[in-house]
């Protein structure tokens, strides 16, 4: 054991000096220990032959530690060697500063020369040079100076202090302009516009409409590919005045939508058919000549097409629709709701078994005549037409129909019919003295009823009610009574409705029993309400007043002669109270049946018990 401890001392105690770690031969010690492990035979002989696992673990740990120290020492030696080599080369180089203090690395040849301005004579004039462009080469790329939108320019610190965003503790978290939704403008498409530039959501919708009209006028000749068309439309919707890019194409474009009457050529090349080929050839030759001379050219403006050409062309109803285009929103219109009257609604077929009530609708003329006509008021002065606002419309409607039918009959029957009608009217005036003459302008209307030509086709469509003159001849509008107020009218109608609706009430078995109970208990409850209040002291005084002297015996039956049953009960309670106060003595015969109705009372004192308590004093107080 001591031999093992001495052998592995350097493994248990790490060596701090890196150079001494190289003195330990880790490979040899591990090889020796491996040979010892090969010689050990593990057997189940009661623990005589054992293997020290702790010793093996310490050996491996110590070996790894020493090996790492060796690597670390070797690493440091390599860096020291590199530093030594570099320092040696630096020492061998001569110094750049001489004995006179002049640095040889720096040159001062032109130190004493005078300063001169930079000469600009060597710059070549661009006007004297021409740019050679091939005829078949078309420049599509235009260099545009990028301009940062104001919405992307970070705000200054002073602007952030105007509207700060503070927390609950008062700490400044951010500013209002730190959020894009506060500095940008929402677009109808859902995007945030960096610069508004006078553009509003309504102008965006108007722009789409103008674009559709221009595309219809342009037709197939100036068609634009779908990809570029969508991009151009998106760019135009984001800016109020889109920048017109340079154009080197060989084709015309539709008129601009800004209203100035001029436009630019499109960016695409397409062939045109018809009479425009000659004009296009002239434009192409002119642009090629300008391109060879100057090197660049702007898009030419086309003459504005007349507005009549756009209006005359109609949209093709069979063309395909854009599935991504928003449909036109139509305002919601609420329809009319009609409610059928009760009498008409019950005539409809229904599977529900309900009791059919009689129809409450009656003839309007009969109801109106019975409600608004009274013989006592016939002689009074009346205004033309009814005064009830709800009935006035119906009244004039019926009168208008009658007059229209009457004029139609006059036109068809001739002058003879007019004479007969006049005679009949005179006879009716004599027979009916209650009828008062009307004014000359009683039924003068400025509406369609006065126009005879409007009713020439009403020959057989005369209302049936107008053919029965006797049934409708006595109807005259009257005014309501002056003293009848609105409240009284409502009360009268409600009472009439309640009286008429009582017979339609459905009676059940439970309702019949309740009604019988009410008929039985109603009189009894009314009788109890009419009785006087029960005062026990008052009834006690009445009972003692019937005794002539103290000590007299009287039966309770004799005292209660000719009394009501409820009075007997009250006197019985009063007698029990008197017996409790020792004012009377109660006795009866022994036996259950023998003692029935044998109650007798004897007066013990005529002094009232409740009065004694008013003058009662305690013995302790009276002795003092």
From Swiss-Prot:
Acidic residues compositional bias, start-end: 269-279
GO cellular component: nucleus
Keyword DNA-binding: no
Subcellular location: Nucleus
Keyword Nucleus: yes
Coiled coil residues, start to end: none
Biological-process GO terms, alphabetical: chromosome condensation; embryonic body morphogenesis
Keyword annotations from UniProtKB, A to Z: DNA condensation, Nucleus
Primary location: nucleus
Residue numbers spanned by region Disordered: 215-239, 252-287
Family annotation (InterPro entries): CNDH2_C, H2_M, H2_N, Ncaph2
Role: Regulatory subunit of the condensin-2 complex, a complex that seems to provide chromosomes with an additional level of organization and rigidity and in establishing mitotic chromosome architecture.
PANTHER family cross-referenced by the UniProt entry: CONDENSIN-2 COMPLEX SUBUNIT H2
Subunit structure: Component of the condensin-2 complex, which contains the smc2 and smc4 heterodimer, and three non SMC subunits, ncapg2, ncaph2 and ncapd3 that probably regulate the complex.
Family: Belongs to the CND2 H2 (condensin-2 subunit 2) family.
Record's protein name: Condensin-2 complex subunit H2
Source organism of this protein record: Xenopus tropicalis
Organism lineage: Eukaryota, Metazoa, Chordata, Craniata, Vertebrata
Encoding gene per record: ncaph2
